[in-house]
Regions:
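Short Cys/His-rich "knuckle" micro-motifs
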Residues: 51-53, 307-310, 339-341
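Short recognition patches in nucleic-acid-associated and regulatory proteins
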Residues: 294-322
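Auxiliary Fe-S-binding modules of radical SAM enzymes
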Residues: 2-28, 52-55, 206, 210-294, ...
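Cys/His/Pro-rich metal-binding microdomains
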Residues: 37, 41, 298, 330
Length: 356
């Protein structure tokens, strides 16, 4: 890890930061903050952080490579403005294990995705924990505001922090969720924003939750259900009836249900649900990508995908490479050819449209 008593940094190294997600209900996970102090028995993230932390003792000796601050409650927090790397130049993803860490260099990653995605913010942390400085959260929210093509999904066990920080609620792409694992957690939904997009994650489902006529279903836009995973001796496998009662009540209230793969052994493939709210089905694109993919029909002026139109090319002398100067939709291209007595060329795209 150390070279001459100091951790090496590599500004160009941006690996292991924003990944195509293995979490079924989102496209990407974005982890500008890692680490958590909830100490949940079933936490998968803690185990992952321990696997990819390197030698924490040596990492902490590289004091020039990170900053330290205290939370409002007095806990030690770490700040990385650049990724910490080992002697081979590879990023140490969690150099302080599961201790709360702000990876500031990861803040710009949503800008690198040109197509709109459903991004789970903070899969390796609870970014709304009481120990997380308000300034960290505001920096993350500011990035979300500046990159509105994505849907941002937040999940916490401390939803009252949503109200403490006055999160933006009048935007369709900001989704605020809370985790409910047992009957004692039900009250958490009361702290979700009064308006805006709200969801709950019942994962892991640890006991029977009274779902029938529960007012929570009047307030949420989506529900995710999953079972505890891993090999813990204390692992709880939910009963099928616990799951189906939640699903049935969600159906009665027209709340989309997403069931994670961990439920397949319990309910069976045929009973699995992969429902998404409408707002998470629509993919937006950046202005730069829009200009790359779309253009105006030269004749009728209708905007369409370039791939669905005929490219117009011209050259002034034989042997010159033709230059593209515009596009024309299939119908307009046919009319154009007829109008000028030009034989309509046999193009695959036009033949496919005729066959359809």
């Amino acid at each position: 890890m150390l070279s001459s008593g100091k951790a090496m940094r590599m500004k160009s190294d941006r690996r292991q930061t924003m990944n195509r997600s293995k979490i079924e209900w989102c496209d990407h996970t974005w982890n500008p903050i890692t680490g958590c102090l909830h100490n949940c028995r079933y936490c998968y993230a803690r185990g992952m952080a321990r696997r990819f932390c390197g030698d924490i003792r040596l990492n902490k000796l590289a004091k020039d490579d990170y900053k330290v601050c205290e939370s409002a409650l007095g806990e030690i927090l770490y700040v990385l403005d650049e990724p910490m790397t080992n002697e081979t130049g590879n990023a140490i993803v969690y150099p302080f294990g599961f201790e709360p860490t702000f990876h500031r260099y990861r803040l710009d990653y949503p800008t690198k995705l040109k197509m709109g995605n459903n991004i789970f913010v903070g899969a390796m942390a609870d970014i709304w924990g009481e120990w997380v400085p308000k300034e960290w959260i505001n920096e993350i929210l500011d990035v979300c505001r500046k990159n509105p093509i994505h849907n941002y999904l937040f999940l916490t066990k401390n939803p009252k922090r949503y109200r403490d920080i006055c999160v933006p609620i009048h935007t369709e792409n900001m989704w605020y969720g809370t985790t409910i694992t047992c009957e004692a957690d039900i009250g958490n939904w009361n702290y979700l924003p009064a308006v805006g997009k709200r969801f709950i994650s019942v994962e892991p489902l640890l006991e029977h939750i009274e779902a029938r006529n529960n007012v929570i279903f009047d307030w949420i836009d989506w529900i995710i259900i999953g079972a505890e995973t891993g090999k813990s001796k204390e692992k709880v496998t939910p009963h099928r009836q616990w799951i189906m009662e939640i699903v049935e009540e969600a159906d009665r209230n027209n709340v989309p249900v997403f069931m994670k793969d961990s439920l397949i052994p319990i309910v069976g493939d045929k009973n699995m649900r992969r429902d998404y709210p409408q707002g998470l089905k629509v993919q937006k694109i950046s202005e730069k990508m829009h200009n790359k993919l779309y253009d105006i029909c030269y004749r009728c002026g209708r905007e369409m995908k370039k791939s669905d139109m005929i490219a117009l090319l011209a050259r002034s002398v034989r042997g010159e490479q033709p230059k593209q100067y515009g596009f024309m939709c299939n119908n307009c291209f046919r009319e154009h050819c007829k109008e000028y007595g030009i034989e309509i060329p046999k193009l695959k795209k036009m033949e496919d449209n005729i066959n359809e």
